[in-house]
């Protein structure tokens, strides 16, 4: 996705640059426009793969689909990096690996005074946890 740069004049003395992405959104910072263009690229990739999405869960059949979803989420969660002085994608799920054809849930918990928590679970894991929990009651009955 290309980012188009334009110069505009607000008054005779004030000029500024604005950056327009392919979906028509306008940004005043190039790095923010670049991150949004990356989001559009990864969103298109996820859509082209045919990944099903419902309520924050994604059904990934291949590792390539899983990586596209993780990258898309990274571009959704961009932040300003003071050291680099630009907006950058935040990939909190890069340490998680593809574990086969499954539904993947990506969670984020905001902690006021502590670092935020990010984790991923699969539907198979949740089913196994529920089966184990149910089994303890069936055994004691």
Map each language-model feature to its residues.
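Residues at or immediately preceding the N-termini of alpha-helices
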Residues: 30-32, 63, 127
């Amino acid at each position: 996705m290309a980012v188009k740069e334009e110069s505009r004049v607000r008054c005779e003395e004030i000029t500024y640059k604005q950056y327009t992405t392919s979906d028509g959104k306008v940004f005043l910072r190039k790095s923010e426009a670049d991150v949004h263009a990356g989001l559009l690229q990864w969103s298109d990739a996820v859509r082209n793969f045919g990944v099903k999405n419902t309520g924050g869960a994604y059904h990934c059949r291949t590792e390539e689909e899983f990586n596209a979803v993780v990258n898309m989420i990274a571009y959704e969660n961009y932040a300003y990096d003071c050291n680099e002085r630009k907006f950058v994608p935040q990939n909190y799920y890069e340490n998680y690996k593809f574990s086969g054809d499954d539904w993947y849930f990506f969670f984020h918990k905001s902690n006021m005074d502590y670092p935020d928590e990010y984790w991923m679970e699969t539907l198979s894991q949740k089913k196994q946890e529920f089966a184990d929990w149910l089994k303890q009651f069936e055994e004691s009955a």
